[in-house]
């Protein structure tokens, strides 16, 4: 127990880095995923093909490979072209996590949009709204509510996936645990503490998304008022 208490400040500092990485990745991933998800429904087949190729690539290859590809691969490519280019660990980590997350969020967005009844599109069209206005004012607000549970799952998955950026030396929670074990050699105690912190983070944010889902559900609000 003494070893865990002594290591706790370093592990908590790593946990903060983990949360920051996750928040940035889900933010950029949501922006990219929304664009990709709507593009997947485009009437233009080249757009659909390009977005599907992106999604299949990032969903079909290991995240660890993608991290190495971005952090080591791109600088090597630029060097072969005679250009001096290096990636900051933070930038590479956020980019890899964001690009990967965008591929999964794209399918969440696509599913959310397609879950809206076709009659609502037709009703909006009869009111004089164009496709963009219909998407913005009618479809997306409803689809977003339905996306909250899978987005919550993606967020908790990302928290765990951040541990992979330890391979490029980014000192998030898992990397802090590794460095601590390298100094005190108490692998069982430290990695147990690391696992429990990950669990606590996931439980906390899972509960937050559950609350958000209830808040965004009009039927739940009506029930509360009725009670």
Model-inferred region functions:
Residues 1-227:
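Transmembrane alpha-helices and adjacent helix-loop boundaries
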């Amino acid at each position: 127990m003494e070893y865990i208490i002594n290591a706790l400040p370093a592990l908590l500092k790593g946990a903060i880095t983990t949360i920051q990485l996750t928040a940035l990745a889900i933010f950029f991933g949501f922006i990219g995923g929304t664009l990709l998800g709507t593009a997947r429904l485009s009437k233009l087949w080249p757009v659909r093909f390009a977005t599907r190729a992106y999604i299949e690539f990032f969903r079909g290859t290991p995240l660890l490979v993608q991290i190495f590809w971005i952090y080591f691969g791109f600088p090597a490519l630029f060097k072969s072209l005679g250009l001096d280019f290096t990636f900051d660990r933070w930038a590479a980590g956020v980019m890899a996590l964001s690009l990967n997350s965008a591929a999964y969020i794209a399918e969440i967005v696509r599913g959310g949009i397609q879950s809206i009844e076709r009659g609502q599109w037709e009703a909006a069209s009869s009111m004089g709204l164009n496709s963009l206005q219909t998407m913005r004012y009618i479809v997306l607000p409803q689809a977003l509510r339905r996306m909250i549970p899978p987005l919550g799952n993606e967020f908790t998955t990302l928290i765990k996936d951040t541990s992979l950026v330890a391979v490029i030396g980014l000192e998030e929670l898992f990397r802090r645990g590794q460095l601590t074990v390298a100094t005190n050699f108490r692998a069982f105690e430290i990695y147990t503490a690391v696992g429990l912190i990950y669990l606590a983070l996931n439980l906390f944010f899972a509960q937050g998304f559950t609350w958000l889902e209830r808040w965004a559900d009009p039927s739940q609000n009506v029930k509360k008022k009725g009670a």
